[in-house]
UniProtKB/Swiss-Prot annotation:
It comes from the Bacteria. Binds 2 magnesium ions per tetramer. Keywords: Aminoacyl-tRNA synthetase, ATP-binding, Cytoplasm, Ligase, Magnesium, Metal-binding, Nucleotide-binding, Protein biosynthesis. GO terms for molecular function: ATP binding; catalytic activity, acting on a protein; magnesium ion binding; phenylalanine-tRNA ligase activity; transferase activity; tRNA binding. The lineage of its organism: Bacteria, Bacillati, Bacillota, Bacilli, Bacillales. This is Phenylalanine--tRNA ligase alpha subunit. Tetramer of two alpha and two beta subunits. Its cofactor is Mg(2+). Belongs to the class-II aminoacyl-tRNA synthetase family. Phe-tRNA synthetase alpha subunit type 1 subfamily. It comes from Bacillus subtilis (strain 168). One of its GO terms (cellular component) is cytoplasm.
Amino acid sequence: MEEKLKQLEQEALEQVEAASSLKVVNDIRVQYLGKKGPITEVLRGMGKLSAEERPKMGALANEVRERIANAIADKNEKLEEEEMKQKLAGQTIDVTLPGNPVAVGGRHPLTVVIEEIEDLFIGMGYTVEEGPEVETDYYNFESLNLPKEHPARDMQDSFYITEETLMRTQTSPVQTRTMEKHEGKGPVKIICPGKVYRRDNDDATHSHQFMQIEGLVVDKNISMSDLKGTLELVAKKMFGQDREIRLRPSFFPFTEPSVEVDVTCFKCGGNGCSVCKGTGWIEILGAGMVHPNVLKMAGFDPKEYQGFAFGMGVERIAMLKYGIDDIRHFYTNDVRFISQFKQA
């Protein structure tokens, strides 16, 4: 039995050494070390040996098995290394070649416009305030001089969640909340950007959800001339230094007096074209002096403090600035549309 084990070892080691592929090595492993292999058969015949020979033959069989297994492992490692070298030699990489370009996204045009407006007002000493999109009826209407049953509420059909809770129809509630934090002491100088919601039918110029930026200044001795000067500066910064503005009388429950603000058409320079519908002017926002009732409900004495407020639709500003003819383009996630603003 001892000679048979040594003979099996010699045959196995010679075959392993001569093996030229991983498959051949695996076949040798199965042939000699498998459950039906000769070494296993030898171990099964140990019972026929005497009690004295059994330990000696058992130890020898295990040594032979271990040497064959080690030889197979070494051969596998060597063949795997050679196989990898051949694979790398056939797949040479030229590291001097330029890499594949990485697709780079662009900021959304609404983000570009919002950041531009925020930077403009921050440079004028304003701070940016935000508030909840799900608002109470009090802050969305009553605190803005729109009591229950007020006819002006029909101007903004709303998405109500409960009887006293709704999706805000404007960012004006942020102004009231901020004034309350000041506890009747000025100055207050803020802008408040954010989403607003109204029950409009979606079309080229209307959306049930859109972005709005409102501004508020409250301090002593604030006048209409302060509002006009601010809006003139904004128009020139946003649409060009040669722009002029005009104020038209209007009505908003939370301001008195109230105005609509137009800017000279940036396409025709005020001469009249299709963009301005031949008028030479384009409406950009609404504004006015803060109504005394709004100041009073927010904790300010209207005899001591005055203020002005303004609000603009971000989509409208972006449409005018970039010549976009349909508000729905902003929300369709069409990469062909958004990619045009990569450089913006």
